[in-house]
Amino acid sequence: MGSVVDAPTVVAGQEEVTDNMLGDKKVTVVFVLGGPGSGKGTQCANIVEHFGFIHLSAGDLLRAEIKSGSENGTMIENMIKEGKIVPSEVTIKLLQEAMIKSGNDKFLIDGFPRNEENRAAFENVTKITPAFVLFFDCSEEEMERRLLGRNQGRVDDNIETIRKRFKVFVESSLPVIEYYNAKDKVKKIDAAKPIPEVFEDVKAIFAPYAPNAA
């Protein structure tokens, strides 16, 4: 099975991406990556509102599948309970199904791929390469400050687990960012700035995808 990794590189921000078909529809996929507390969720909501993208969170899709009580959901729940990593193919299948069901052709995929294996599997299985990767760059100190300061009732927002999550991000997700950076497909955002300023930077990147930017 051929990989799209060697497909001709295209300039990020252009609609012309190689082999990006979902059924009979050409699609635009943007991977959204950043450490815990980097502000990805807030900005994804802004992008959805202003640019007509569908926001897909791999974690949310897995949780929804577990909640559905399906056979697949039970299998996912058992794997998580046993501390095993859910196979990439399972997550990718959920992402594909959500993309098809949405009827849209522009997608933000948030928090995935988490590692190189995820990335390679996504490209091999879907034959879709991202138009670009939106990377929310933020120091560990700032992310820690934000996570400890917000009150979302998340049990995993204590200092030790925050540091563990950050370490996992650096070890697993940064190689994905480096891979796409070598292909000139990373749009880096200074996520330490105030939310409105961050969105100004985001808007400049997404301008070609505005509904009236034909």
Curated annotation (Swiss-Prot):
Coiled coil: none annotated. Belongs to the adenylate kinase family. UMP-CMP kinase subfamily. Binds 1 Mg(2+) ion per monomer. This is UMP-CMP kinase 4. SUPFAM superfamilies: P-loop containing nucleoside triphosphate hydrolases. Its main location: cytoplasm. The lineage of its organism: Eukaryota, Viridiplantae, Streptophyta, Embryophyta, Tracheophyta. Consists of three domains, a large central CORE domain and two small peripheral domains, NMPbind and LID, which undergo movements during catalysis. The LID domain closes over the site of phosphoryl transfer upon ATP binding. Assembling and dissambling the active center during each catalytic cycle provides an effective means to prevent ATP hydrolysis. ATP binds at residues 37-42, 150, 193. CMP binds at residue 118. Residues 57-86 are annotated as: NMP.
